[in-house]
Amino acid sequence: MKTALLLGIHCHQPIDNFNYVFDDAIEKSYKPFFEILAKFPEFKISVHFSGSLLEYIRKNDKKLFCLMQELSDQIEFFTGGFYEPVLASIPSIDRVAQITKLNRYIKKHFNQTPKGLWLTERVWDNSIIMDLKSCGIEYVIVDDYHLKASGAKLDNLNGYFTTEESGEQMGVFPINQELRYAIPFYSLEKTQDILHKFSQEDGKNAAIIFDDGEKFGIWPKTYETVYEKKWLEKFIIQTLADETIEVQTFEEFYTKNKPIALTYLPTVSYFEMGEWSLNSSDGFELENIIQAHPELSKFLRGSTWKNFFTKYQESNWIQKRYIELSKKQYDSKFYKEALYKAQCNDVLWHGVFGGIYLPNLRDNAYRYIIECEKQLDQGHDIIDIDMNGYNEYKFKNGQLLSIVSSKQGGQIFELDLLKHNFNLQNTLTRYEEVYHHKIELEDSETVKDTKTLEEDDDIATIHDNTLSVDKEISLDYDWYLKKSAIDHIVSNEITLEEFAKNNFREYGDFANQAFEVLKCSKKKLHLQRDGGIYDVQNLQTTLCKNYHFKKNKIEVDIDIDNASSKYNYLHEWNLHFASLQEVSFNGVTLDTQEQYSMIEIISDSLIIKDKYLDKTFVFTSKNLSKIFITSLNSISQSEKGVDITNQGVSIGFLYNLSSNFTTQIDFDLKKREDSIV
């Protein structure tokens, strides 16, 4: 009775993540893993590293890179997109280019021609098969859940399957979920018992595990278990000594064995990803159904990975921006490299890790989007970027690139400082998440009982994290996108706190509804909405919003007809700053330690000084009643627990309305010493 153990690790860090994150991962995970592997040349393993991570290691830890080269005889290197895109989310031409780039890198540095591909986040879509075949790929890694979702028998997921698209075949290896949750979290005895379940007389059964290398040292409490308590070394010794287990690479097993059956996979990722991509109400309902009826889990699934583009509009915007730029196929190596880097997947979704909630990841994506834009001509363009059936209007003048959405309240969706490769509109709307309900139900004394786990030499995975907070938080959500030049009709008695928490009453229908485009020229955009003010008596009201995009300046003219002095007009901007503690508002700074830090100013101007960017942003207007300023913070989960993350600053310019109201808001970009750029 024998089992073929196919063990693989996937290692990746987001493009341009902080150096200390890379270095910590190298010291706590990658380096000790390969140092232990070097002690056992007969222990074979399959490995996937994203290209950007390999490059970082090559440049910053030559010793580790050389060790990986020395071990190449016992390692099978898997390929993928060089900068770790979700392959189904990028155009075919970029898919082939990114895989080819990593193939060549592996051949050059490790003298292997990859036959296997690590499927980023195991996001399967049949549309990728033709491109994979053109790159020489013979098999990919998915989850057993992919096969379960296609109707495969649960007791038959112990080898590889084959699938096809237009007659092009592809091998499919399903990762065993039980092993994925066991290694390296269960005791050695429990793990070995699971492996023995796969034993078969002819030795053709495979125990398949291919998962994050960061589980070995980076995930909470794993460094102590895996290396200090020598779980990994003991596991290798125990496995090699077990005559019923034969350690193989995926290529060896693929070459020696026939597929189990033909299968056709649905468009799906691993089960948890389907849960995460649901909107909060559906996600909460699915969670309750699974808890009540675990026997139905085979027939239940969440949404597809691409649903993140509808769940988080900021994710959709980034993805559609690089789709737009890819279509141009500008013939420049620098342009294409920037484009491929922008396609890194981490920023586009959210599960256990920060993802879309991490401003630095969004900054990195926009850095490369803007690098591409800088190589294109100045001027204006009209295009449906986000593919919602409504055009966006792009203006590139001087050092500013501005994009306005006609559908979403005529808001400014993107505001790029071209010289700095920085998007001031890289804000994030406050979304409701399923796990927010868990935070609400817990108190500061709630601590997960891990004694039983410790007694069994098991450790909890990040999926078992307790979401507790050490101080009271306020869960507040936004019903409109937090971008800029947003039009509100509000009460005369609106307060700063109501604005901050977005629980003020909205009387108008202008903030998130479509505007008609009356005129668009090289530097001007005229918008109009025939809407209303909705109260005891409804008023048909027209709001005209005219943009003038000058060199390093934006003028916004507002005309509101048939309004009422019973209400105030609130004009809202939301701006993103890379280092909020280095930003002042008319000389006052926000407290970055508080969930809500608020400032109320009575002035006709607002001077924002950003020491980090070495820029000053000046808003001026007439007849202002007051200015509201508040931090825009999100509540999200990560591998460490609950994060309160600054996503920007909300600024509200408040005016007393009249029957025929007119005002102008000017936004000036200046150097920090206040001279015009």
Role assignments for model-derived ranges:
Residues 379, 384-385, 389, 502-544, ...:
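Beta-strand-rich recognition/accessory modules
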Residues 23-27, 93, 97-100, 401-519, ...:
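Acidic-aromatic substrate-binding/catalytic surfaces of carbohydrate-active enzymes
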Residues 1-115, 122-181, 188-203, 228-244, ...:
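Catalytic alpha-helical scaffold of carbohydrate-active enzymes acting on polysaccharides/glycoconjugates
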Residues 2-31, 38-40, 157-162, 166-170, ...:
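Active-site and substrate-binding clefts of carbohydrate-active enzymes
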Residues 138-204, 210-217, 228-229, 268, ...:
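Loop-rich catalytic cores of soluble enzymes, especially ATP-dependent carboxylate-amine ligases
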